[in-house]
Amino acid sequence: MYKLEGGRMKNQKPTWNSQKTHIEKFDVVVVGGGPAGATAAEALAKDGVSVLLLDKGGRIKPCGGAIPPKAIEEFNIPEELLVAKINKAQIVSPKRNKVDIPIENGFVGMVDRENFDEYLRVRAEKNGAVRKIGAFNFISRNKKGNNILVHYSVRNKIEDTESFPETVMTKFIIGADGANSEVVKQEIPDS
């Protein structure tokens, strides 16, 4: 195992030394605990894969929370998470022209994202995923390039600040951290 020396500056590769230190190891690290990340972590954990679900926590996404019936069935979403069932939609133009859009399969379920996302994260944890609240910082690799190290900041619950750095080792990383994914920006620079 390797230890990162110092902090990371933008566009600067971290340096390594050979000092041994204990770093938790996971087969997969999932960055982002929204529906995609939480369900990926759950599926992997159910298959016996050691997985860390890393999520910032403490925020609500600006999303309508619409879930089609097929997804409700396939992802085994309990009825009590549905806050409404919508059976039609309407588009209104700036000139007030209206177009009704029928909803196939009878309805679209609406969920409160705060409750829904937390339900999925808890379900992933109950199925074996390790869940940590923290902010993803960066990815680095050892000199051989065969170990991926994921660096993140853990939230200090007493002071409610992201204060101390942590590092885990993994074989694979899933960037489920949204449209402006920091994981993707680092791994695919011109994306």
Annotate each predicted stretch with a short phrase.
Residues 43, 123-191:
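Predominantly flavin-linked oxidoreductase catalytic cores and closely associated redox partners
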Residues 23, 97-100, 160-167:
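Short, mixed charged/polar active-site loops
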Residues 37:
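N-terminal Rossmann-fold NAD(P) dinucleotide-binding loop
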Residues 70-126, 133-134, 140, 145:
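A conserved beta-strand/loop capping segment in the N-terminal third of enzymes
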Residues 3-8:
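Short, Lys/Arg-enriched N-terminal segments with co-localized hydrophobic residues
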Residues 29, 42-63:
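Glycine-rich FAD pyrophosphate-binding loop
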Residues 20-34:
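Beta1/beta-strand and adjacent pyrophosphate-binding region of the FAD-binding site
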